[in-house]
Amino acid sequence: MVRLRFAPSPTGYLHVGGARTALFNFLYARKMKGSFILRIEDTDLERSQKEYEEGLINALKWLGLEWDEGPDVGGDFGPYRQSERLEIYWKYARKLIEEGKAYEVYAYPEEIEKLREKLLAQGKAPHYTREMLQQFTTPERIKEYEKKGLKPAIYFEMPRKEYVLNDIVKGRVIFKKGTVGDFAIIRSNGVPIYNFACVIDDHLMNITHVLRGDDHLSNTVKQIALYEAFNWETPEFGHVSMILGPDAKKLSKRHGATSVEEFRDRGYLPQAVVNFLALLGWSHPEGKEIMNLNELIDAFSLDRLGKNPAIFDPKKLRWMNAEHFRNLSEDKMLDVSRKYLLKFVTEDEIDSRKDWFIRLLKSIKDRIEELSEIPNLVEFFFLEPDVTVDLSDEVKEVYLRLIEEFEEVEEWNEKNILNSFKAAMKGSKVKGKEFYMKLRIVLTGREEGPELIDVVYLLGKENIIKRLKKHLG
């Protein structure tokens, strides 16, 4: 059975790149009837925060990416927080030391930095060897560390050989001999380095596939070497293309919103965000663009993951969100819009006038790209606009007749509203375009908006007459 994981660090909000990684792992796990695991990589003690972990979990749940095992749901391979697995890492680090594949380094950070600068000054890559690093391991230094209560770092001795990766996305990748030197696996504070911890965890959690961004490709040679050192089977790796901004540069804050939480708060639907992210580096075999999560699972395959960078197009996301909003059932449309309507009315009012609010939303749904636009689009239905429209005497006369016609209407429906329009304009020289355009501005304070018949029907007889009378003095 396939087992895939998403392993974020709780050092910030869920970036769209991380969300896409989670999505691809989720889709393949579900497609193959396997397991999707959430693991929290919180070994960066200074930057990891509980609130970020909660934010990551909430953002993933909002997207609909439910996991089978994780810190909140448990499982057979826990704990699922790296900070709760430190003894496990130490056990395997000691094993490498015993086998002569790793060694202790009693060097201070500034000494490592000086060594790095020296190598660079000599025109060499900053690749360390056991000989270089163990020059600091003297009896005096060991005593000094013990006296200060310090612990040595542990370095893995990188075999000087060529490594070959058959990547799911990139194909055959060759890491030439000497690509990397010896590297730390345990810091002097006892906390494991990323490359070491994730290898131990992926092996012990029986992870079969690792799908991640290609910014991790350089880490892979270190991880393959560790798998070989332990004589463990290596999972299948797939490195998906980077996400770039519209200017073809790495996606960052300067391009606008980049976290899932930002898009959620701006009124994007989770199914739209998921749909959009899926198409950043993957394509449907028939070129289909609008899909829900189940359709994505059915269509997903690893062979359609692209090698080229994906462009994050905010306009495409807005269009996709609009499409998903229009495809919602009436009840669901009201449900997702509710929090934006509460700016003007109470929950009870929405529930008691459900049909009215559904018609209101249907009247504006073709204008909505972000749900956060709803308050501005519906404001005039609840708050009378402060507007002055220059009306000719002829138009005023027609509007006075319109008031009289409306006052006679007993059943407020589209047919009677349209008949009132016709009756008011009968015999007048006022053109229909002027009549309707200025009526819209008088009633809404705007030149554009929902169909005028919807505006008049939804505002209701009393409001329409009140606004017309106020404007006509």
UniProtKB/Swiss-Prot annotation:
TM helices/strands, residue ranges: none
Organism (species): Thermosipho melanesiensis (strain DSM 12029 / CIP 104789 / BI429)
Binding site for ATP: 253
Keyword set includes Metal-binding: no
Protein name: Glutamate--tRNA ligase 1
Subunit structure: Monomer.
Stated family: Belongs to the class-I aminoacyl-tRNA synthetase family. Glutamate--tRNA ligase type 1 subfamily.
NCBIfam families, sorted: gltX_bact
Segments carrying motif 'KMSKS' region: 250-254
CDD domains listed in its UniProt record: GluRS_core
GO cellular component: a single term: cytosol
Entry keywords, A to Z: Aminoacyl-tRNA synthetase, ATP-binding, Cytoplasm, Ligase, Nucleotide-binding, Protein biosynthesis
GO biological process: glutamyl-tRNA aminoacylation
